[in-house]
A protein has these predicted regions:
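A short, structured loop/turn motif at beta-sheet edges
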Residues: 151-155, 189-192
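Short, solvent-exposed loop/turn segments at secondary-structure junctions
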Residues: 131, 168-169
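A short, acidic, amphipathic alpha-helical segment used as a generic capping/interface helix at domain edges
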Residues: 142-151
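Generic beta-sheet signal
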Residues: 45-47, 154-162
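N-terminal signal peptide c-region/cleavage motif recognized by signal peptidases
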Residues: 22-24
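Histidine-centered catalytic micro-motifs
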Residues: 50-55, 160-167
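Active-site-proximal alpha-helix that buttresses catalytic centers in soluble enzyme cores
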Residues: 30-125, 130-133, 139-140, 174-184, ...
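Bacterial N-terminal signal peptides that target proteins for export
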Residues: 2-14
Length: 210
């Protein structure tokens, strides 16, 4: 009898473990893709946290700098400008409403918004690079970004343009191998917090279906 009870307990334990694994698997597959992602974004209510588009690590010389780049900051390269423009065109083609745009004050982040033809961005120090070209970030920036993604807009989407170290510090569990221009898209978790619903590379936006 004792061995029978132990066997039943073992089977019950396996059942619990299986349930946990299934739940974990379901959580991993709840990210939106393709048409489902487009439809969700068309309804609005999401935060799109993106890394600025491609930019060389070395700032330009005075001779090579854009006319507006008076402080000789890092600026987008041709690939970055093209990708940012295609990203913006995709948002308009897909009729994805964009309300507020928050941006790092850096030239390369503002360029990303400009080439994408997004609404005029509001510059936010917490999204910036602290003037150190992102050698490190600080806890207050991470806390600000973590709080910001719980402010869900109604009927539109908010875009935040920042830097890889800021995103990695705030969301280490979701930001591994984040590429230039890639976005993390956050929605409500139904409990007052935010959850990741998609990761979209900047060159994937033009491929999304109408």
């Amino acid at each position: 009898m004792k061995s029978h009870r132990l066997a039943n307990r073992y089977l019950a334990f396996l059942g619990i473990i299986s349930g946990v694994l299934i739940a974990a698997g379901s959580a991993q597959t709840q990210q939106l893709q393709g048409k489902a992602l487009v439809r969700a974004l068309q309804r609005g209510g999401y935060l799109i946290v993106m890394r600025h588009a491609s930019s060389p690590q070395t700032p330009p010389t005075k001779e090579n700098a854009d006319r507006q780049n008076i402080n000789l900051e890092r600026q987008l390269d041709e690939s970055g400008r093209t990708a940012a423009a295609a990203f913006g065109n995709a948002l308009r083609r897909l009729k994805i409403p964009v309300g507020q745009v928050l941006s790092s004050p850096t030239y390369r982040a503002l360029e990303t918004a400009r080439f994408a033809q997004l609404p005029t961005p509001m510059t936010v120090p917490e999204l910036g690079d602290n003037g150190r070209s992102m050698q490190n970030t600080n806890e207050s920036q991470s806390a600000w970004l973590q709080k910001q993604i719980t402010k869900f807009p109604r009927g539109s989407n908010t875009i935040l343009i920042t830097h890889q170290p800021n995103i990695a510090a705030a969301f280490p569990q979701w930001s591994a191998n984040l590429s230039d221009g890639e976005a993390l898209i956050f929605g409500s978790d139904g409990k007052g917090g935010a959850t990741l619903v998609a990761r979209v590379k900047i060159d994937e936006w033009p491929k999304l279906p109408d």
